[in-house]
Amino acid sequence: VSVTVDAANRVRYSVTPADSSVEFEARSTLHTVRGKVQDLTGSIEVTWNDDGTIAPEPPAKMHVDLPVEQMRSGNGLLDREMWKLIDSKRFPRVAGDLRTLTPGPAAGRYAASGDITLAGRSRRYDGEFTVKHDDACITIEGELNVDIRDFGLKPPNLVVIKVDPGVKVRVRLVAARAA
């Protein structure tokens, strides 16, 4: 199968903050902490093949970031402790940058590798996500397990409560075609 790609198929999208979110879940010996942030910004740039798949060349680009102090669990005390752990005054944003993208096992699924920058440190993670698009927008959804120790962060221990260093992160990006 041969698919032709031309520059006309390259599309830039801007992340729509109101429709996009990052949800997180961390476990402790007492309970599960869940939270969400919606104030995401960023851009996605892809070249579409004629069959609606993302072309490997030129490589897709994606940059997304979010403000640490918009990460909310519904518990103000926990939120402030989380921001303090991340050192939100020195490192007010978390960023994600796509490095590689390859077609996955099923239509609309892709394997990705990218860098997450948290608390001033960048680490490479691999994952898989789904992509849906139409003429006006693109929607990307995926899940990733992040270990906060990779970023030099120590899981908090509050007397008898221990927090697991693994955090499950679910991402939903909705981005509108840029003019």
Q: What spans do the regions from the language model cover?
A:
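Low-complexity, acidic/polar, glycine-enriched regions of mature
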Residues: 1-179
